[in-house]
């Protein structure tokens, strides 16, 4: 109202201004000019029907019928205009005051059910209908009554027809978890006021159609963040909502059940530990399983075409263990495999938690597994070395191959040894060598030289690439010669003993491949080849010996018997590579080597080196003399 009055005063002043401009005391305006003035000044406050009323009033104001309105007539017209304006303003102020109660009730109802309103499929969000003034008094009451009783909302007959045509089941009829709340059956109304001239008021209703609550508690409450899914039951496709707990419910569950959560965490940690243990157990089992399977395949490939009695009892120490491991691998139950698979799936989910602990446990088990695996293989290698000290025995190479195949860790120690092809040996030599093997094993049982063979083999592995580059053509003889030289750099006090031991080992392997091959004639071998090969081998040995003297400050302790034995071995190996010798020459060379070695051991550095071809000594007697000399040398070194 104050704004309207200010607008009226502005109009009066403008009217007076126009009148002054016209000149004279009587200022006049036409009806058109006055209407334009009123619309421009106070048209924002007035409705269009007010201006129609002003035109009728202006016709009455033109008393003199001259078509102009004087200032006095204008003042009367203005105050006559204020009557309908005041009436409209009073209606605008009074009608919201009447509807405020219902609006407050609707606001309360909407706040109560705001989180649970779900629109029904097929029902429009808004519906318009006519409400007469008799219905206005009761417009705010049905929602309140429906909120208390929970009955079906009041709608017109037309809306009843539309509602009955819709599916009445919003959710699945057999869901025992949820119920429809009472506040869902609400009618939200917003009344737009109309003037008294119209006589009819328009009411815009936002109706949320919710079916009547069924007697059986089988309805489910639709909630936010829920996933819609469809089910087909009793030939009716209905939409239902899968309930998810809200944040309040999750908070209450966490506050009410702390003991259950602690129990769940404890069980989760136990499951994680079990998964870690199962995974490490499985990894250790697979590592133990794969090696024996490969070993058995290699041993089967090597044993093809051989007699069962050829293998001595010392070389079969690892086979029962490998067979037991293979049987264990094939005997794993299916349930344990499934359990390991499930444990791996659990472990992948808890990898960030158990990664550190699982690595530590796996490393510990792997180290223990290597320690257990290497302990029997070291014993087997020691026994193989003891058996190799006897010259002429043909089973040591077979035992060495079997032990290398059964333990991949001992493969490094055996890679520098020469690969000697086994030929057929007569039955008499086999029986003779077997008896000497047993005798040698009993004598050398407590000898310190047998204990250091493994260390010698590891020492020889480090310098193997240098020897291969210098002697690619005759690598077998080079490896046999360089072993005592490399051992001389390791320990000064044990040089003579170890050189003799390695000489015996190399000599043990030489007669195995000196048997004559079928289809080749001995006349094809030329004797001048022997001095050339022996000279080349001796020259190379001199270079290697010179290198060992530079590394060892005390050359007096370098074994002279080792030098003579290496020279003789070079001669025999050169004969072996260039061709085949008759059995007589082979036996004489072998006897010469034994006699030279024994004479060098007993007589000192000045003893003769050349072998005597006239002597014919039995192989076992030479072996016994050689072992006695070796024992005497080892006692002197100690």
UniProtKB/Swiss-Prot annotation:
Question: InterPro entries under this entry?
Answer: EF-hand-dom_pair (IPR011992), EF_hand_dom (IPR002048), S-100_dom (IPR034325), S100_Ca-bd_sub (IPR013787), TCHHL1 (IPR042937)
Give the Polar residues compositional bias ranges.
166-179, 343-357
Q: Where is the composition biased (Basic and acidic residues)?
A: 221-246, 294-309, 318-328, 358-372, 395-409, 419-435, 479-490, 526-548, 622-631
Recorded superkingdom? Eukaryota
Q: Which intervals of the chain are annotated as region Disordered? A: 134-638
Q: Which Gene3D superfamilies match?
A: EF-hand
Give the EF-hand domain ranges: 49-84
Annotated GO molecular function terms are: calcium ion binding; transition metal ion binding
The family assignment reads: Belongs to the S-100 family.
Output this protein's name. Answer: Trichohyalin-like protein 1
